[in-house]
Design a protein with these regions (language model features):
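Short beta-strand elements
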Residues: 151-167
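Mid-length scaffold segments of soluble, non-membrane domains
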Residues: 77, 82-109
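Bacterial N-terminal signal peptides that target proteins for export
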Residues: 1-7
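Short, solvent-exposed, Trp/other aromatic-anchored flexible loops in extracytoplasmic proteins
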Residues: 84-87, 104-154
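C-terminal motif of bacterial Sec signal peptides marking the signal peptidase cleavage site
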Residues: 14-17
Length: 167
């Protein structure tokens, strides 16, 4: 019995450690406070952070492939934060959260980097999954929060982004 308990505990702790700094899970209330949402709604289409001009691109989709549920999988998002002049993305910046806005509805979520950063690359790529079942075929606004080593925050917006469908 002790051996089984120890093995179970080891597996549980291993799984709990998966996902890095912000495992993809429902966003805490901290991402939806009135103060944070005011920053989200005021987000600019481009920002200057850590000496670089930055823009946001997105790839939003819902999966309707045959193995998906009949009403499709929840929304997934890849967010590409790119330097305006194609210079190296500032290494001190990280993205920690994102919001997808559909009218008065908001999906707030943690994001995580999808792959290791390449030195000199102009883009930071982050990912989120488990969103609402909006669309496909509708436009939404997307906001990402960037932070630096001093924990200063910048909010960057991409307007009218299409939610696509995969079949």
């Amino acid at each position: 019995m002790k051996v089984r308990s120890v093995v179970f505990l080891g597996v549980a702790l291993s799984l709990a450690g998966c996902g890095g700094e912000h495992p993809l899970k429902p966003a805490p209330l901290a991402l939806t406070t009135p103060a944070v949402l005011a920053q989200v709604h005021a987000a600019a289409d481009s920002v200057e952070a850590a000496g670089a001009g930055l823009r946001l691109g997105t790839d939003l989709w819902r999966d309707f492939m045959p193995i998906a549920p009949p009403d499709g999988e929840p929304l997934r998002a890849v967010l590409l934060i790119t330097t305006a002049d194609s210079s190296a993305f500032p290494p001190a910046l990280r993205a920690d959260a994102a919001w997808v806005l559909k009218g008065d509805e908001v999906w707030a979520t943690w994001v995580k980097e999808t792959r290791p950063r390449l030195p000199g690359a102009p883009t930071l790529e982050v990912y989120a999954e488990g969103g609402p079942k909006w669309g496909p075929g509708i436009e939404v606004d997307v906001v990402v929060r960037l932070r630096d080593a001093a924990d200063r925050a910048w909010y960057l917006r991409a307007r009218e982004q299409m939610i696509h469908r995969t079949d």
